Design a protein with these regions (language model features):
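Conserved, well-structured ligand/cofactor-binding cores
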Residues: 1-138
Length: 138
């Protein structure tokens, strides 16, 4: 277990949990639906965050480049997972083995991106879910 803190207090999260305290609060505060945010949106957000990190990497001193390279690598890892999910889902219609792969991969993705499609705010919870996933992988 790990303890995370924010301005609202503290929460324990399991060591396997990739997201952080803000995402956990969103899960608890917005149990309005059981439909998760569409992976196409998360994929697009990851592309934007990767592009921003690559841009900043070119603007900072060498000592800071390692941080941005870690962010880009984390984005690449998560982008691959979202691409695999989309690919397996399309193939699953034609092949039972691919259905099993799609289900296994989706369970992995569901453990990373847990925010509900219906939530308060302007997507802040989803943005934090993606940010925390990138940060904890980087």
């Amino acid at each position: 277990m790990r303890l995370e803190k924010d301005t609202l207090g503290e929460k324990y999260l399991t060591d396997e949990t990739v997201y952080g305290i803000n995402t956990q609060r969103a899960v608890e505060n917005f149990p309005l639906s059981h439909k998760k945010v569409n992976l196409h949106l998360i994929h697009a957000m990851l592309l934007v965050k990767k592009a921003a990190a690559k841009t900043y990497e070119n603007l900072v001193e060498d000592i800071e480049k390692e941080k941005y390279q870690a962010i880009v690598a984390a984005c690449d890892e998560l982008l691959l997972k979202t691409e695999e999910d989309k690919s397996f889902s399309q193939q699953a219609e034609h092949n039972r083995d691919n259905q099993n792969q799609a289900e296994d991969n989706r369970r992995g993705i569901d453990a990373l991106f847990v925010t509900q499609a219906l939530q308060g705010g302007a997507g802040t919870s989803t943005n934090m879910n993606v940010n925390e996933g990138i940060a904890n992988i980087a």
